[in-house]
Amino acid sequence: MKPIQSIKAIQYRAYGAYAENRFVDLPAPVANDGQVLVRMRTVGINPLDNTFRSGHHYAATPENLPRVGGQMGAGVVVDTKSPSFKVGDRVFVTGPGFGVIADGTWRELVAAPAASLMPIPSHIDDDHAAAFLAGAGYLVGYLVLTEFVAFKPAQSVLAPGIGGAVGMESVQIARKLGASLAISTASTSAKAEKAHAGGYEHVIDLSRESLRDGVMRLTGGKGVDVIIDGVGGKLTGEALGCLLPGGTYAVVGYAGGREASVNLTDIIWKAAKVRGFTFRAFAPETLAAAQKTLIGYLSEGAIQPTIAKVFPLSDAADAVRHLIEERPFGRVLMRVED
């Protein structure tokens, strides 16, 4: 291909407000040995992108600036130095450290190791491919239920926050794996109604009843076997009280706050297993195998990403603000212009 001298990208050179996401020109990357050059089409936004850019991540140090944001996206191969892919292949792009300790996907061209790419099924468009990765909810839910828990069909799952990636997508994974109940929550009646209209039957409207009352109503007073909590904050203690004896509580995020008050007897008397979740705890082979399985689910229609809104890449600051402050129902994406 004809060499490209410069590309458009979203880069921040200081930690701080949304406006630090700047639309800039950068030198174009090239594919080195073992790498693949991908023209990005649609990229996703993860709450972690905001955590890092705002300076609230452990790796948000001066040494990690400047940084191109973005942890995932969908694109097409335009050059390759790897036998694994050929020019014209449509690919998912994601990898460890993207957008945090290495420049990410919010740019026109990305040179990535072949191991960071996966083929996109031909009938999945770029937006839904990016939405599948954005927020990593499918991967989180699948790993919790297959690696943290010896999950069995007919067990029950609670994943609070139906509009977010972890809540919505963990519910879909739980259904696929045969859960008897896959429960989530909504902070408003409008969001609960949207969830019900989208086929999510067991959503607790927290503006009308407490989490505990809702879980007990849906489970006949029993509680749930597994909790996948990406919300945290004040919801944590109440959710823990809904766990069945011997159940597993996976702490995977803190969209609702980093501090929580819990009744320790809910852990002690129930012999509860409380697990912290980080992708760093899994071997690369485990992550790759999980993604391959999930792409199969996506291809067969067993999981279906929901898109809330698509912005142009140049509006990254507004796009991130929309995700963090508006808390939309579904994934927020950015389309990369040619």
Spell out what each predicted region is.
Residues 2-5, 285-338:
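C-terminal hydrophobic helical "lid"/dimerization subdomain
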Residues 27-45, 57-98, 104:
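Glycine-rich beta-strand-centered segment in the early N-terminal region that forms part
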Residues 93-161:
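NAD(P)H dinucleotide-binding glycine-rich loop of Rossmann-like/cofactor-binding domains
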Residues 131-208:
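Mid-domain Rossmann-like dinucleotide-binding core that forms the NAD(H)/NADP(H) cofactor-binding site
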Residues 161-162, 231, 254:
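NAD(P)H cofactor-binding loop motif with strongest signal on the N-terminal glycine-rich segment
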Residues 179, 234-303, 335-338:
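Glycine-rich phosphate-binding loop and adjacent beta-alpha segment
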Residues 211-221:
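Short amphipathic alpha-helix with an adjacent loop that forms part of the alpha/beta core around
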